């Protein structure tokens, strides 16, 4: 599975999630495994108040999906060792 960054649509397009992304044929069409939120270059648990790290998202909630930078990928790999 490829680690990707998801830029979420709601708000001011400044909410970034990172995880292993699988695109599915039906809604909810995006599975994010090992999901974290990126805040100021650091990873925070997401969603808060839950130990669940795997999420299903609908395609209309996501603005775009991009590859992570080397630095943030390194941070992600550290928390998922």
Please provide the spans of the model-predicted regions.
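Conserved RNA-binding domains used in RNP assembly and mRNA/RNA metabolism
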Residues: 1-81
């Amino acid at each position: 599975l490829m680690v990707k960054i998801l830029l979420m649509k709601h708000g001011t397009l400044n909410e970034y999630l990172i995880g292993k992304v699988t695109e599915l044929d039906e809604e909810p069409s995006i599975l994010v495994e090992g999901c974290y939120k990126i805040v100021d270059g650091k990873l925070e648990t997401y969603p808060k108040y839950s130990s669940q790290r795997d999420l299903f998202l609908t395609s209309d909630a996501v603005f775009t999906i991009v590859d992570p930078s080397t630095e943030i990928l390194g941070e992600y790999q550290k928390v998922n060792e």
